[in-house]
């Protein structure tokens, strides 16, 4: 007789096993039409999942944003169904949900074009109008393999083989009428819920990202809960085209990515200046909050990754290498290396907290289909820190982390920040007393900082609760960047300890802290937020000195020397072009200030100034300009002079 507890605290007892759907029919029959899936003890389950034991049950409805992923997964299956109907000999490859949509790889014997895309979308809409129900059934891996083998779905067989590494038992398949696919997530109950979708583009990709493999057609699409959300997204896509960091980066000559090295960034001079300026800013804050900056190896012995738990939980995303009969893991994150530094000497409770930071070069084997400019790459730099502290220090350390994050985000002009506190999941280490204190410390730190936040119940990591801070950009997009994470597990796994006041060994708490997250990704966010118009302190070139003719070249060379001595990033444009041509070109390059020097300026020891926003200032005293410019740079101002 399972006792079912609901989110509002009420309970009901049932005589035997019962499905989540039947529970809802009992407690709120009028809500069944909008019911998407359930959560049982914090785990998402299908509507028809059976509950046999005492459980906490939550109902998730179609208006809930958490349904987006399952709508998109179901859209992928719908896309596969339409592909097989239009081109029966085609084969379905990898697919996944992206931040604002989904993709699916297919093998066909022709190259896709716009007509193919329109035909496919029309077919999908016909299927949606049938309003068919989606069913899920569990099979042994052997039986599932037979099903896909009989259908000549060679890529699905490969994906099933990969599942063997994780379960060795059974696999769930979803049935869209005659079409069958691997169930990656819960499906929507009815395909009509996928009606707010649009196929957007296509491209060619190598299977598994390897050039020696077949070229597949990758189809990208987007889907949303409501029509209004879809239309808003499509409108934003148009706006984003002018903000696309990949296009702007070409104009500004920031970086490039090569086809033979996907997900790896080649920083050019201009881009590397932006990168280094961000590091300089973070270093100012690291000094203020008393961090020690370190550097740990890019690869470490496999045993460290095994002991830390990363090999068991993160192996699919790690690059491994062998040398001299040793196996090494290239680091996907910095934390195990920081624990090695903490463990290098015996620590006293008086030494804590110890704050270790690093601009660590990390590598993650991201799927080729998920790679996107600077936003999703395989080699990135984390502005990562780990604070080793006592339990009584958690609250103050977390408060300092929050303060640091807000100070930095304010510099960039981000005003709206979404803060979430993720609490204990069902599967976790540590007792409830530790979790109670940890969650309370995080909540107290947020409240004392006068920060509004929302709970994400059951969404913490198995080793500790966390705070997530997400930025809203000018288009309303949410970027999850900063995290503050408590960790009870890693110090135990890697045998970290300090000597307490009773001269006994005690395990420290680790606070994981990142502000920008991936620096590369943060640069991508800034490019799109500023549309390439970096604040002067961050701009690769802050001032261009342009002469009207050769008579004024000596004067601008003297100005250049003065700027160089002050650390102002400037360059000379002495080309034999008209001054109007030079101005247009440098405005297109988004240079904050263009200095123009002609006869009058040379004679009076002044400058004429043109800002990239189009404002002109005549006969400005050179020292006055330098003073204003240095003040603007040193204060991290987001505005140009007189804006």
Curated annotation (Swiss-Prot):
Q: What is this protein called?
A: Threonine--tRNA ligase
The record's Gene3D superfamilies line, in alphabetical order, gives: 3.10.20.30, 3.30.54.20, Anticodon-binding domain, Bira Bifunctional Protein, Domain 2, Threonyl-trna Synthetase, Chain A, domain 2
EC assignment: the record states 6.1.1.3
Function, in words: Catalyzes the attachment of threonine to tRNA(Thr) in a two-step reaction: L-threonine is first activated by ATP to form Thr-AMP and then transferred to the acceptor end of tRNA(Thr). Also edits incorrectly charged L-seryl-tRNA(Thr).
Q: What cofactor requirement does the entry state?
A: Zn(2+)
A GO biological-process term:
threonyl-tRNA aminoacylation
On assembly, the entry states:
Homodimer.
* Positions of region (Catalytic): 244-535
Listed under GO cellular component are:
cytosol
For binding Zn(2+), which residues are annotated in this chain's numbering?
335, 386, 512
What gene does the UniProt entry assign to this protein? thrS
**One example GO MF annotation:** ATP binding
Chief site of localization: cytoplasm
The root-end lineage is:
Bacteria, Pseudomonadati, Pseudomonadota, Gammaproteobacteria, Enterobacterales
Q: Which Pfam families match?
A: HGTP_anticodon, tRNA-synt_2b, tRNA_SAD
Q: Which CDD domains match?
A: TGS_ThrRS, ThrRS_anticodon, ThrRS_core
